[in-house]
Amino acid sequence: MKVLTAIALSAIAFTGAVAAVITQEAFLNNPRIHHDQEKYLIELAPYRTRWVTEEEKWALKLDGVNFIDITEEHNTGFYPTLHSASYVKYPPKMQYAEEVAALNKNLSKENMKANLERFTSFHTRYYKSQTGIRSATWLFDQVQRVVSESGAAEYGATVERFSHPWGQFSIIARIPGRTNKTVVLGAHQDSINLFLPSILAAPGADDDGSGTVTILEALRGLLQSDAIAKGNASNTVEFHWYSAEEGGMLGSQAIFSNYKRNRREIKAMLQQDMTGYVQGALNAGVEEAIGIMVDYVDQGLTQFLKDVVTAYCSVGYLETKCGYACSDHTSASKYGYPAAMATEAEMENTNKKIHTTDDKIKYLSFDHMLEHAKLSLGFAFELAFAPF
């Protein structure tokens, strides 16, 4: 590990470790900067931008610095600065406890384990790699199978590939309701080894294979409701598996940018990033719980998320913070959509093996992942029928 770190840091030092901060106006006056210098425009906080090389992006992540890569979205002329979030009133209490409890009983740890074993068998799911494309193709087939077996496709449900220029595509499963008001549940499908992304293995069991199979199982459970599968819910529900989160939320930005342009009415977005590791909390003497982000999120939706945990999960929740741009909910927020995020524990007790060859299934708890699946299903069902 130390040798790999030295190699990575030497490469970073050679290219220059620090890039200059650049204003939005400077970019607009110099549209060729990115192409001439092969650098990327990242945002480390709202409106705080910097040009970096790809190696410098990975160095920042190794140092625990979050960012969102806004280069491609900026080049389209639709600069993704923060939009004001639309106000949405969420249900003050659960309305469908009986229905959700019955559906939650059918969620399967065995399904999640089998899916995660296959998903982590790809050498890496790095978004620029061929195996990243193959893993996305495998996942697409699983999502399509779940939708097909439920019968929902006969009532208009679809599964589509959202293409990106880097190769690995994002996946969108859409379960139409009686209106186009939409509830989104997301996870990112890509993985990365920060030392040598194009070469070294990145099983990504927890980050974010766990979230990927969690919402896949929640989708399967949700579609066992005839009302949902037959399109009788008030609202449309979408499940997203984003490409290139590790590169700076690239896939989710492309999707929510598209939604903003097309005036899509997104009423809620929940991101599940890392749902399987509990040993860190237990070692710290902290109770097993779901971590609920309380920074850079919609406060009303976050309160609703807490209420869902209390109503439908066997564990409680703990508030935590991850800073700006820690996962794909950032993209939804940037385009004015209410967003929330759940993770496996308080941030200080989350998995420290991520982004390495050792992010493996053996460290994960499928019992805990089941709680996140219950959370996802309850969130989706309650909001599918919410009177927005």
From Swiss-Prot:
Binding site for Zn(2+) 2: D207, E246, H355
Chain sites annotated for binding Zn(2+) 1: H188, D207, D273
Keyword Chloroplast in annotation: no
Note describing how the cofactor binds: Binds 2 Zn(2+) ions per subunit.
Cell compartment(s), UniProt: Secreted
Glycosylation sites: N106, N180, N232
Disulfide bonds: C322-C326
This protein's UniProt keywords: Aminopeptidase, Disulfide bond, Glycoprotein, Hydrolase, Metal-binding, Protease, Secreted, Signal, Virulence, Zinc, Zymogen
Range of residues in the leader sequence: 1-19
Gene3D superfamilies: Zn peptidases
GO molecular function: aminopeptidase activity; metal ion binding; metalloexopeptidase activity
Enzyme Commission numbers on file: 3.4.11.-
CDD domains reported for this sequence: M28_AAP (cd03879)
Broad EC category: hydrolase
A Pfam family the protein falls into: Peptidase_M28
GO cellular component terms, semicolon-separated: extracellular region
Assigned protein family: Belongs to the peptidase M28 family. M28E subfamily.
Assembly: Monomer.
Function: Extracellular aminopeptidase that allows assimilation of proteinaceous substrates and which contributes to pathogenicity.
Protein name per the record: Leucine aminopeptidase 1
